[in-house]
């Protein structure tokens, strides 16, 4: 039996191991297509700013071809470095495309204000054909996407600081699209807006330079359909991370956006580890979980073997991503989702509608959290040096805070406050025969008010009121005089208050659709 278990562990380990490079050793290359990427031919800020302006307008052209759009986006993504050409050559290793770098310089002879740098040959016509587009023959204005603020005509600037801010604003909006472009492009608008608001509040971007929705949709669709563009973006992120020392501000912003990009499409695997295993609930000891725990262990080892590309396996369309799907460990995943829903409110919006979802193990996770609330793990307590007395104290505090948390989830309860209102009528009060009690007219429309004294109170009445009846106080029906002087004084004060209230109601105008609200503290005390 020991040899069987050893063989099983070895089998599980080798089953998920990626294939090793062997055999003929030749790399398989596909049929490549050429991508033209314009880069600045000098260090002038004017050249870069003008190139950025032309590229943004090119991307906003709805009729732009796919390879041309990819080249324009690669050029925009690399404009923040000192030598874009060297960066592109260093990080690009794509079997599907061949990148051709073209240096761009200023020119007064072209319509676009830019031309391709060449030795002895004029490339003005080629530059105009690349950077500009022809208007339709029918005379209609061609639709193009630009910034939401249509008053912005161009983004050409002369100073480096202004150029960096405009470039950072455009790059932030492009990089934010990568997080959801592959996994959930249809529901990405809300999360993208939250990221944009965050960087606007941090003054990393300029809010006035928010790109048009059509422009962003064009770029998002291109990122989703072009693997080569995603490979370049991932390679650029990894190159920035490897850079030692202080990084440019735009590079730091890209690394910050990368926190939303990494592990995209791997939520099932990551959350299963977080809620199913790291919580260390005793339910992991069930026999049903034994096989799936072994699967998770082998997948974690495989994840580490993939290195720095592992968090981007879904974005890079790596075929090994299917091994990390929740379908490989459905029971453990269902249990982990139940634990997560109970522990974190953000898990409530997760979509569980999958064929391998098991409701029984989902409820197991929920009940495990509920019944283990406030309990301290003995193994963890011994490692941390927690005594039994301290463990009991922690359990008591955890139970108290758990009850407080449950109370907060229902939301604050607002006390109902009512006011005296002048309604469209009153009602004659019935005679009262009880001692130390006087009945006042009850006004009913939407709010009901009770005025209390020490021995006198008003009764509520739910009968409809007629607008033709006036509110009156029947003095003859007041309670008989008490022999106690103090009680008589209180009775007199209460009667005065009731009469004052009745006079206010009688003086009001009937038929008013917007009744006034009285909140006189002296009358309501």
From Swiss-Prot:
Coiled-coil annotated residue ranges, if any: none
Q: Does the keyword Ribonucleoprotein apply?
A: yes
Q: What are the recorded GO MF terms, alphabetically? A: RNA binding; structural molecule activity
Instruction: Indicate yes or no for the key word RNA-binding.
Output: yes
Q: Where is this region: Interaction with the phosphoprotein?
A: 477-505
Where is the stretch described as Disordered?
Answer: 402-490, 506-525
**Ranges of compositional bias, category Basic and acidic residues:** 433-464
Q: Where is this region: Homomultimerization?
A: 1-36, 373-391
The segments labelled Ncore in the record are: 1-403
| Known role | Forms the helical nucleocapsid (NC) in a ratio of 1 N per 6 ribonucleotides, protecting the genome from nucleases. The nucleocapsid (NC) has a helical structure with either 12.35 or 11.64 N per turn, approximately 20 nm in diameter, with a hollow central cavity approximately 5 nm in diameter. The encapsidated genomic RNA serves as template for transcription and replication; encapsidation by N is coupled to RNA synthesis. Forms the encapsidation complex with the phosphoprotein protein P. Before encapsidation, the newly synthesized free N protein, so-called N0, is chaperoned by P.
Q: Its family?
A: Belongs to the paramyxoviruses nucleocapsid family.
* Protein known as: Nucleoprotein
What organism is this sequence from? Answer: Rinderpest virus (strain Kuwait 82/1) (RDV)
Q: Which gene encodes it?
A: N
């Amino acid at each position: 039996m020991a040899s069987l278990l050893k063989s099983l562990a070895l089998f599980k380990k080798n089953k998920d191991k990626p294939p090793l490079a062997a055999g003929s050793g030749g790399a398989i290359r596909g049929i490549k297509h050429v991508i033209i990427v314009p880069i600045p031919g000098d260090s002038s800020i004017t050249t870069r700013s003008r190139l950025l302006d032309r590229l943004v307008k090119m991307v906003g052209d709805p009729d732009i071809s796919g390879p041309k759009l990819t080249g324009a986006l690669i050029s925009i993504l690399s404009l923040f470095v000192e030598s874009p050409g060297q960066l592109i050559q260093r990080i690009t290793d794509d079997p599907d495309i061949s990148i051709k770098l073209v240096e761009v310089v200023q020119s007064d002879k072209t319509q676009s204000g830019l031309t391709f740098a060449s030795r002895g040959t004029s490339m003005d016509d080629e530059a105009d054909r690349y950077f500009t587009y022809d208007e339709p023959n029918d005379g209609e204005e061609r639709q193009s996407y630009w910034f939401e603020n249509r008053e912005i005509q161009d983004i050409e600037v002369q100073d480096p600081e202004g150029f960096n801010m405009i470039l950072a604003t455009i790059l932030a909006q492009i990089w934010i699209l990568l997080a959801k472009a592959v996994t959930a492009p249809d529901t990405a608008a809300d999360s993208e807006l939250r990221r944009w608001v965050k960087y606007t509040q941090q003054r990393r971007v300029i809010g006035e330079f928010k790109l048009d929705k059509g422009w962003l949709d064009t770029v998002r669709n291109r990122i989703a359909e072009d693997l080569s563009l995603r490979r370049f973006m991932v390679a650029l992120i990894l190159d920035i991370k490897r850079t030692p020392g202080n990084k440019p501000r735009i590079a730091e912003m890209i690394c910050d956006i990368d926190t939303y990009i990494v592990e995209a499409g791997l939520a099932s695997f990551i959350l299963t580890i977080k809620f199913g295993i790291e919580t260390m609930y005793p339910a992991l000891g069930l026999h049903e979980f034994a096989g799936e725990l072994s699967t998770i262990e082998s997948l974690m080892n495989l994840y580490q073997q993939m290195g720095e590309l592992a968090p981007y396996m879904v974005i890079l369309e790596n075929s090994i991503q299917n091994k990390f799907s929740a379908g490989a460990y459905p029971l453990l995943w269902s249990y982990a989702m139940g634990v997560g829903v109970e522990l974190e409110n953000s898990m409530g919006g997760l979509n569980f509608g999958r064929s391998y979802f098991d409701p029984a193990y989902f409820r197991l996770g929920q009940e495990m959290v509920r019944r283990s609330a406030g309990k301290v793990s003995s193994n963890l307590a011994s490692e941390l040096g927690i005594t039994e007395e301290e463990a009991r104290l922690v359990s008591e505090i955890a139970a108290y805070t758990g009850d407080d948390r449950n109370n907060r989830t229902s939301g604050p309860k607002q006390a109902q406050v009512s006011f005296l209102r002048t309604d469209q009528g009153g009602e004659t009060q019935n005679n009262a025969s009880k001692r130390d009690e006087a009945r006042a007219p009850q006004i009913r429309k939407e709010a009901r008010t009770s005025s209390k004294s020490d021995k006198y109170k008003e009764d509520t009445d739910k009968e409809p009121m007629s607008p033709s009846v006036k509110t009156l106080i029947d003095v003859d029906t007041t309670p008989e005089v008490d022999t106690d002087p103090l009680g008589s004084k209180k009775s007199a004060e209460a009667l005065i208050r009731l009469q004052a209230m009745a006079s206010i109601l009688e003086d009001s105008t009937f038929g008013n659709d917007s009744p006034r609200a009285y909140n006189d503290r002296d009358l309501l005390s």
